[in-house]
């Protein structure tokens, strides 16, 4: 496993993340790629992307039931990436995403 690359100094999570399995698409540099989200919160996500996603990439993440969400990759190690949404999800949006994940 490679070394974690971080866009900024690590700080503890302020929001709990829920475990999910959502196969979807992430787009960066105008290139859509497959990604499997493995956890999700109102502020961000962690996923596995076979192609990898460069640190600090501006991304659009297609969340079933919500459509595309804009954000930025905050850390990356191998195929795993973590990102933060530009605009946090509200409770109703997070509930919709969770319902889609377990439908």
Region roles according to the model:
Residues 1-103:
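Structured alpha-helical
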